């Protein structure tokens, strides 16, 4: 809200509050002046203290208004930081007004003074308005002058994005239960039945005691006991059905959340997985979704049950004694405020705990997935120490949670104890003065204990809900995330020649925005031809593959497939006509048949066998115990490196792709297997456009076109003989290889490319 509007509204209310309160006070004390009332103040008969409370809250609002008006940038911040002050003031005045009503009832039975009732009601109206106006002033937008550098309220930093409100997150979470509305209605019905049955139990228990102590009637006692038994049985059955339905509903919610989260994750752009650790994503998908469904289901169940019980208990309590009911409710606002403070703190701690657990999970996942490497360096103890340090960070946060919970239980328990002692003392006074019977006092005390248990449960529910909401915010952060690179192409022609053109391609990884990996790169891949990319490490060879696979967006230029931008093609179609075999292919924990036919809806077994034969994999597959039904293990761990490459080659060839990319695809093969695969590729060139990234001279020299990259630029193009004749970088690389001075067609460059994500492809 603008500053002048907030100031006008606040000043208008302060004037109204002081005027109305003063008028009511004056009409209620026509028989004496203000000075006389001050000199002879009687707390049992005067409302001077309520008038003074009005002046105090008006001064607070005026001070807040002046502070915001003088500095519209810093003032609202200070008000937001001091919300606890106005909360305590309103809470104290509200409790004092209740106590004032009880004191008046001691000398005026009943209270018939309309001016007292008018001031009593107006006090609560003005307290609510004061609290709201404080919040209104805290949301004032600063003027332009207040934001100028050098101003008192100018801090120079941008405000952090506001966190999504807990209520909105909870509402969004519950919206995922819409398909289960019928189940929720049934569960709510049985919840109400069970809660009402539990609410009537103390009443009929008191009736049973009265029939023995007062009426001394066995018939009335038997009737009361039968009713108690029926209520207990009925409420127990209803509670069991309610719990079962809620458990079913939130189990379905858990499945729904995980499915939505997983679908959102697999739709993200490739850069997203470069920036986020696998352990963090797995933690969101497993522990966070489980925590959300478990905590929210359990706590919503408890909250609804206790809400219904509280409603019934409050009705019975007011019917027994309105005075003791006011005494009871004096303490509960304090408990609610403590619960609110604790809940916010616990929510923040919960998010920190989940993040710390995710970091620990990432460490464990990284170590276990690379156990052979860890063992080869005898680094087991060091990895265990790293994991222990991560767990110790979690433990430190757990200690904070324990301390916060201890303080919360201590504060709420002490408040409940004060309320119970006050009820006993004041209730005894009412019984002695004849305003209440002893039986009603006993019944009221029973209901007060029930109410206390309900409020304690609601308090624990709040902290549990905040913990669940904290996890839900992390889950929704990924569910709601829109990928920055959308695969919305629609082209899917029946015939594709397979011509690929790189036109002035400039590319930068999002994780390294200031380093251009490719700079104005241009070359073409022709149908029926083999093109080889060579160059030093970090020259951009694998980046060209990533771009051709449409993994990343370009910063400049374009890549064309048959004259059309690759982004214009349908996502599934594009990766059916372009197949990739990487240096370290990833197999899935499935059978060899399923791995070869991965990503294809239906593939005849004969085509699987034919592709395996072309990839020189059929022989070793048939030697396995289960043949093509053999499970490859996690990431193909049951197969050797060469066997995995041949299965990955078969996975690419079974698609009969117009464009075939081999990124060091034969590096783990023996010479004979490599020769057979090369023969299969060169023998079927009329159906493939082949791009090879290789370091072996035997693989490169047979290519129809060799493209030499250096530092992200194309420095040479031609056949093997042409490039040797030209001299230059390619000739140096060949010479070094032939002399054995360096690894084949490669040397260490000044920079390295980030790990390629192409291992997720065939």
UniProtKB/Swiss-Prot annotation:
EC class of the enzyme, as a word: translocase
The protein's assembly and partners: Homodimer. Interacts (via TMD0 region) with LAMP1; this interaction strongly stabilizes ABCB9 and protects ABCB9 against lysosomal degradation. Interacts (via TMD0 region) with LAMP2 (isoform LAMP-2B). Interacts (via TMD0) with YIF1B; this interaction allows (but is not essential) the ER-to-Golgi trafficking and strongly depends on a salt bridge within TMD0.
Record has Ion transport as a keyword: no
InterPro entries attached to this UniProt entry: AAA+_ATPase, ABC1_TM_dom, ABC1_TM_sf, ABC_transporter-like_ATP-bd, ABC_transporter-like_CS, ABCB9_6-TMD, P-loop_NTPase, Type_1_exporter
Residues with site note (Intramolecular salt bridge with Arg-57. Essential for the release from the ER): 17
Name of the molecule in the record: ABC-type oligopeptide transporter ABCB9
Amino acids binding ATP: 535-542
Tissue: Highly expressed in testis, particularly in the Sertoli cells of the seminiferous tubules, and at moderate levels in brain and spinal cord.
Domain notes: Divided into an N-terminal domain (TMD0) comprising four transmembrane helices and the following core domain (coreABCB9). TMD0 is required for lysosomal localization and LAMP1, LAMP2 and YIF1B interaction. The core domain is required for homodimerization and peptide transport activity.
Site (Intramolecular salt bridge with Asp-17. Essential for the release from the ER): 57
Task of the protein: ATP-dependent low-affinity peptide transporter which translocates a broad spectrum of peptides from the cytosol to the lysosomal lumen for degradation. Displays a broad peptide length specificity from 6-mer up to at least 59-mer peptides with an optimum of 23-mers. Binds and transports smaller and larger peptides with the same affinity. Favors positively charged, aromatic or hydrophobic residues in the N- and C-terminal positions whereas negatively charged residues as well as asparagine and methionine are not favored.
GO molecular function, one term: ATP hydrolysis activity
Reactions this protein catalyses: a [oligopeptide](in) + ATP + H2O = a [oligopeptide](out) + ADP + phosphate + H(+)
A cellular component annotation (GO) from this entry: lysosome
EC number: 7.4.2.6
Transmembrane region(s): 7-27, 47-67, 84-104, 116-136, 181-201, 221-241, 315-335, 412-432
Classification of source organism: Eukaryota, Metazoa, Chordata, Craniata, Vertebrata
Species, as recorded: Mus musculus (Mouse)
Residues in ABC transmembrane type-1 domain copies: 184-467
